[in-house]
Curated annotation (Swiss-Prot):
Belongs to the DadA oxidoreductase family. The gene is dadA. This is D-amino acid dehydrogenase. Pfam families: DAO. PANTHER family: D-AMINO ACID DEHYDROGENASE, SARCOSINE DEHYDROGENASE-RELATED. The keyword Heme does not apply.
């Protein structure tokens, strides 16, 4: 079967890998000049199944109101005359109940755990290198109240058999020795030893190279204009290269997926949530993190990537605006200065922003659509890197007519019907 994938981010390329492994003829089209040049380019770098949680949670509406008055807020709302923005926020608020949070987190952990296992298998199969480390994730708490709020998350981790450790301050420093120089009080942390780190952009580039060696074609610099349809079937993709035809199509365009899908009557509830990152050259190994530390206070991830530190975070609802804002850089810098002072050359750091494709319930949209040969693999939010291999394998099995290894019906877009 000939399969055309729209999008060459980490999710699209992972999907291409698994489809090609099943013997399909695979073509990937993307407007950029190489793989992983959008959201996958400089994300926070963690592969964190245990930390997979929906943003929609009990208490979040009140937290957002408080955050909006803070100078180093992890959340920024730039209101627009945009029905999609307000509809998405309304749907997200509807998921801020205890029952919805438990349901959505369970979905996310299920897929993320599966994805981590698929990533390990892929690494064994290919020998791919991407500055990866298997040293776990440490969710760091500055207050006792933050620690007390982990009970529900721990219950979900237990239900899925996810390993975890509750640490006091000394335990946090034992796991991350650089924290001994922290400039702020530390109460404790939740360590997830099964989590990993790695450079998502490097992984995507290397996996694309492996795909090319296996016969996958990449059409870079290709603008996607829309779909041609006949009844319940996609007949072609209209593009800057003309009509691109295949037997099956996969939309893996991240935040841009809903703009294309609405042309054929599919309302994908995905909204771009801008995130920022800094990549800092390490100047003192002893002061630097060894893996990923999640600063719970500011919702910022500080990750070791080879001889660099990647600091990523903030959530800015500003539509498709990717402009860099220096006040967000100050937020990132503040966290790394407080937790890992003198670890890197901050003036030499690169500053980046990208759009995370967020769904209201935090769970990606994977599976079929009303068009029998169009499939979705999109809406992974902040967890595209964490969920990429599992999502790719899952959809490849579905397209190939194989029974997937995990439950998947609740990941399809049909959950938003009505």
């Amino acid at each position: 079967m000939r399969v055309l994938i729209l999008g060459s981010g980490v999710v699209g390329v992972a999907t291409a890998y698994y489809l090609s492994r099943e013997g399909h003829e695979v073509v990937v089209a993307d407007r950029r000049d190489g793989p992983g040049m959008e959201t996958s380019f400089a994300n926070a770098g963690q592969v964190s199944p245990g930390y997979s949680s929906p943003w929609a949670a009990p208490g979040i509406p009140l937290k957002v109101l408080r955050w909006m008055t803070q100078p180093r807020s992890p959340f920024v709302l730039r209101p627009k005359l945009d029905w999609a923005q307000w509809r998405w926020m309304t749907q997200m608020l509807g998921n801020c109940t205890a029952n919805a949070y438990a349901r959505n987190k369970a979905r996310m952990v299920r897929l993320a755990e599966y994805s981590r296992d698929q990533l390990r298998d892929l690494r064994d199969e290919t020998g791919i290198a991407y500055d990866n480390r298997e040293r776990g994730t440490l969710q760091l708490f500055r207050t006792q109240k933050q620690m007390d709020h982990t009970a529900d998350d721990i219950a979900v981790l237990k239900s899925y058999g996810v390993a975890y450790e509750v640490l006091d301050r000394a335990g946090c420093i034992a796991a991350e020795p650089g924290l001994q120089w922290a400039q702020v009080p530390l109460v404790g942390g939740l360590r997830l030893p099964g989590d990993e780190t790695g450079d998502a952009h490097l992984f995507t580039r290397e996996l694309a190279r492996i795909c090319m060696e296996r016969g996958v074609s990449f059409l870079f610099g290709t603008q996607i204009h829309g779909f041609s349809t006949q009844g319940d079937k996609i007949t072609a993709i209209r593009s800057s290269r003309g009509d691109l035809m295949a037997d099956a199509y996969v939309c893996a365009l991240g935040s841009y997926s809903p703009l294309l899908l609405k042309q054929i009557g599919i309302a994908a509830p995905i909204y771009p949530v801008k995130g920022y990152s800094m990549t800092i050259p390490i100047t003192d190994e002893t002061h630097a993190p060894v893996s990923t530390v999640m600063d719970e206070t500011y919702k910022i991830a500080i990750t070791r990537l080879g001889n660099r530190i990647r600091v990523g975070g903030t959530a800015e609802l500003a539509g498709y605006d990717t402009r860099l804002r220096q006040e967000r850089r100050m937020t990132l810098e503040g966290s790394v200065k407080e937790l890992f002072p003198d670890s890197g050359d901050l003036p030499a750091a690169t500053f980046w922003s990208g759009l995370r494709p967020m769904t209201p319930d935090g769970t990606p949209i994977i599976g079929p659509t009303r068009y029998r040969n169009l499939h979705l693999n999109t809406g992974h939010g902040t967890l595209g890197w964490t969920m990429s291999c599992g999502s790719g394998r899952l959809l490849a099995d579905m397209i190939s007519g194989k029974r997937p290894n995990i439950d998947h019906a609740d990941l399809a877009i049909a959950r938003y019907a009505g």
